[in-house]
Amino acid sequence: MNAKILVIKVGQVETLTFSDGSQYESAIRKKVVPSVKIHSLGAEGNDVGLKKHHGGVDKALFFMSADSFNELNALLNKDFSLYGYCDIRRKFCRVRLE
C-alpha cells in the first residue's frame, strides 16, 4: 500500500469569539500550503492552541485518510472543503492510501 499526500494545511493560534461572547485561543482554522518543512515538533508554520493536549513530539502531525474525511462529513452532515479552511480539530493533511 502506498500513501499520497493530497493536501497540507497549517494554522496559527488566534482568538475565536463565539456567539455568547466567550473567547477561545485556537489554531483550529487551517489553510492550504503548497509545501511544509517537517521536524520533531511537527510542521513549520503550524501551531496548536492547547499545548497540554495537542502538539509535542508524540503528537506532532495528524493524518486523515480520504475515506475518513468523507465519512466525517457524512457523520456531521457537513460539506467541509478539502482545499478550504478546516475547522475540524487538528486536521493537518488528507492522504489517500492506494
Curated annotation (Swiss-Prot):
It comes from the Bacteria. One of its GO terms (cellular component) is cytosol. SUPFAM superfamilies: PK beta-barrel domain-like. InterPro entries: Benzoxazolinone_Detox_Enz (IPR052353), MoCF_Sase_C (IPR005302), Pyrv_Knase-like_insert_dom_sf (IPR011037). GO terms for biological process: toxin catabolic process. GO terms for molecular function: molybdenum ion binding; oxidoreductase activity; pyridoxal phosphate binding. Residues 30-98 form the MOSC domain. This is Uncharacterized protein HI_0279. It comes from Haemophilus influenzae (strain ATCC 51907 / DSM 11121 / KW20 / Rd).
